[in-house]
Amino acid sequence: MEAPAEIKVKTRKFSLTKGTIKISFELEGSRGRIRSLKLKQRNAVLDTSFPFEMQTAKKGNTIVYHAQINVDQYPMETAFWDVVASVDKEGKGNYEDAILGGLSSKLKLKLILFPRWTRTGDGHMVYPFVNGARQFTIQYRKYDPKYDSYAFIAKEFLALFCYFILKPYWDHKKLWLICEKYCTMAQDNGLYFFRYCMEHAPEKDRSRIFYVIDKKCPDYQAVKEYDANVIQFMSFKYMIYLSAARYLISTDAIRHFYIWDSPNSIYKVLYQARKNIVFLQHGVMGFKQCHRTFHKGGGNQMALFVVSSGYEQKIIHDYFGYDNEEIIITGLARWDVLEDKSDPAH
């Protein structure tokens, strides 16, 4: 299913209260007229959407739109939801869907500095998803009392304060943080790279290398013997270390170093802006199209891309846009523990 185009508007208001989303915006009459607005699930197969109630008012050559929707009234599913307008851009009565864009920089900053969400009656939460685009995108998912609270936001601000007030001290540690998917796993290249460091790196280097994992997860057992160099995911210490780390080393994208699908926050924005990622990957670049996710210049840009062959290096250079100096042919860390059990007789 092809994604709809975008119509940029001038934002006036965007709020979430008790399950209700309210949007107020302006659009010059010469740029088109919006007939209706809907909340549309971002899904390549399903076509699910729910209508906004909308009122309009004219202000000179501009039309002011006021729209609202109460998500408690609809069977929402865990997903990203775009605000989509039915718009006639040429004034000929030909209406087409277009994602509402134009989230103002001021409002975007406000949503980051002062995060907000609304809880629904069925244990879910709704909040605006703020990324590089300026589109009106909503995320709907289960409410997690551990992280979806103002107490946790206070923890983020305190961690940032403790980092910046002693920034030279923390930066001097030259920390390396290693993780795998969601910081819940230790079974791939991240684990074996960490083990190699623990067993072969000089003591002065080992003291600054840490594996990040939720210690309640089963895979913690794989790194437990190096517990002094294992740090609890989302602990206060970890949040300071994440701010200070010289290198983030992972088999996955930078988002895996933090709570998955967390609401907007200044902490999240600052850490995701980092470009010092060493990408160990999984070893599937030769047949899996990941260039849109990991391309150079994107939100998941890597400082160093680890590959296993010249063939793979060419793929990363040609399709991902990295220079050869940013791609190292080392093989994959987990290959170091492979044992040749073949029988020469066969």
Whereabouts are the PLM-identified features?
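Active-site and donor-binding regions of nucleotide-sugar-utilizing enzymes
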Residues: 26, 47, 58-64, 175-339
